[in-house]
Amino acid sequence: MNVFEPRLSSWLENAGDDDDVVLSSRIRLARNLKDEQFPVYEQKEEIVDNIAEVFDDNFTLIKMNQISLLQKALLVEKHLISPYMMNKSEYGAVLLNEEENVSIMLNEEDHLRIQCMTPGLRLFDALEAALQIDGYVEEKLSYAFDKEFGYLTSCVTNIGTGMRASVMVHLPGLVTTKRIKSVIEAIRSLGFVVRGIYGEGSMPASNIFQVSNQVTLGKTETEIVEDLTQVMEQIIMQERVARTTIKQKFHIALEDRVFRSYGLLMNCRIISMKEASDAISDIRLGVELGFFEHISRQKMNELVLFSQPAFLRREAGRDMDELEEKVIRAKVIREILGDK
């Protein structure tokens, strides 16, 4: 297993429900050990070793103090660790399975953060996988748990189930029709959070948004997932309606925009992250509307992931200035699109 190779994790490679709009679903469970201090201010490496002993050879342990900053950034770009772990978790670690659809962060904000990812809108599948791992760990180790408040976490907003359910969606239709602001406001009014592609503190790129629950106390895991699934079904419906409206009312203008973006990415020699993200979103929309038969959703995910800064530094084999990064990005994008 070489997680640092430029390849997609299984949840970005395989097909899933409603994957014309939904890229992926994720369940994250935050847990702390009963007799250990948290929040994890003074991290103890022995906590990592004790937890890692619970898992078999199906998981690979990667310690943050044994890999480079570039390798940490690659894990962030693949959504396998958080930016917090990359920047602040000296004695943190991550356990990964071969498919890279299970990521267990150790010594992040909490002692354990179990993440399970699935393609498309499959929150219940992700929940089932996460709870199975959680139950296995709880048989071996004692969690910090309160009968009144539930699972105790470093951040009070996670107390209760300790669960964050999130869905990554591509919403170019709602952005183009200028309905995205009202949709986001409606989502927030229902108690959910909308963030960028890399979660808290990140900005949307390629018209990709992350929608997650805010409430973890007073509801069961199943109730939270049911609520988020219902919200996502409404968003999916509205996005599909917006796409149909654009195609019917502005067909030539839309086709021109999509093929201009395709021409740009196929021929560019220098391209910024923002310009690439906008063009990739246009082409992904074109793929979903049937303009391109030779481009798969998998290839679109490759364009998003492998045009990120850390993967470009890996491709170049060195650090780069801003211009060099734009040149390498253009080269990588041309190679991905040209590989039919």
From Swiss-Prot:
NCBIfam families the UniProt entry points to: PRK01059.1-2, PRK01059.1-4
Encoding gene, per UniProt annotation: mcsB
EC number: 2.7.14.1
Cysteine pairs bridged by disulfides in the record: none
Species whose genome carries this gene: Listeria monocytogenes serotype 4b (strain F2365)
Protein name, as recorded: Protein-arginine kinase
Domain of life: Bacteria
Family: Belongs to the ATP:guanido phosphotransferase family.
Catalysed reaction equations from the record: L-arginyl-[protein] + ATP = N(omega)-phospho-L-arginyl-[protein] + ADP + H(+)
PANTHER family: ARGININE KINASE 1-RELATED (PTHR11547:SF38), ARGININE OR CREATINE KINASE (PTHR11547)
GO cellular component, one term: extracellular space
